[in-house]
């Protein structure tokens, strides 16, 4: 437990803890039937039709990140977060990593909102794809050999997982692509530890405008 919740990676540890608590609560309160649609909805899964009817439930764009559909879904995503989260949190720093994780997940769920409008979606993979793409983008902008090597490894994993998203039924391709798009923009927006000049101020501003504009457009289209 001490190794998992490492003080050197407080945000990764926090997200692991919150997601585990949500999953445990789902398990306890449903007697094991935690993968039912009504249970997922009650705990905050992404569901476009209810947001259109009740716009105040837009919080589902974030809450869905912490909800998982069954043991396999939960375990795979938590193992991924454990390893990816530590690496990315070390590169960006804890505060920026927190925003990267949450905003990538939000963008992924906005893609679900527009491109899979009737889907009930949940899981941390929208955020995880954002982590993948952020490091892949940095790989082509940095001279840091560690980030270059990590980015190349992430690119291979990213391609394998995207192919899996296409071939395996029940996986939200829209959410994965959306998370990756969000992470790519955020990699430009947020300065990396020790490499603040990787992107110019004007490049960061353009990326910020594009990110906010795309999010607003998707929300508008989804509500329409």
Write out the residue ranges for each language-model feature.
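N-terminal TM1-TM2 helical hairpin plus the immediately adjacent luminal interfacial "cap"
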Residues: 11-122, 169-171
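Helix-boundary and loop/linker segments of multi-pass membrane transporters
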Residues: 4-5, 49-56, 147-150
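Structural signal for membrane-spanning alpha-helices in multi-pass inner-membrane proteins
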Residues: 23-30, 112, 116, 138, ...
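Small-residue-rich segments of transmembrane alpha-helices in multi-pass membrane proteins
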Residues: 105-106, 131-135, 155-164, 208-213
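Membrane-interface helix-boundary motifs at transmembrane edges
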Residues: 88-93, 142-150, 193-202
């Amino acid at each position: 437990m001490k190794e998992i919740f490492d003080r050197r990676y407080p945000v990764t540890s926090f997200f692991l803890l919150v997601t585990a608590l949500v999953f445990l609560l789902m398990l306890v309160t449903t007697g094991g039937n935690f993968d039912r649609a009504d249970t997922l909805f009650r705990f905050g899964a992404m569901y476009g039709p209810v947001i259109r009817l009740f716009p105040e439930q837009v919080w589902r764009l974030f809450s869905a990140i912490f909800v998982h559909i069954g043991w396999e879904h939960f375990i795979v995503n938590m193992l991924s977060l454990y390893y990816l989260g530590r690496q990315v949190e070390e590169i960006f720093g804890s505060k920026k990593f927190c925003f990267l994780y949450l905003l990538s997940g939000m963008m992924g769920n906005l893609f679900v909102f527009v491109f899979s409008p009737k889907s009930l979606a949940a899981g941390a993979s929208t955020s995880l794809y954002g982590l993948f793409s952020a490091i892949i983008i940095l790989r082509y902008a940095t001279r840091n050999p560690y980030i270059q090597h990590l980015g190349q490894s992430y690119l291979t994993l990213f391609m394998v997982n995207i192919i899996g998203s296409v071939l395996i039924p029940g996986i939200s391709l829209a959410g994965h692509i959306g998370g990756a798009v969000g992470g790519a923009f955020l990699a430009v927006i947020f300065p990396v530890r020790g490499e603040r000049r990787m992107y110019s101020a004007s490049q960061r501003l353009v990326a910020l405008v594009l990110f906010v504009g795309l999010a607003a457009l998707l929300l508008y289209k989804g509500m329409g």
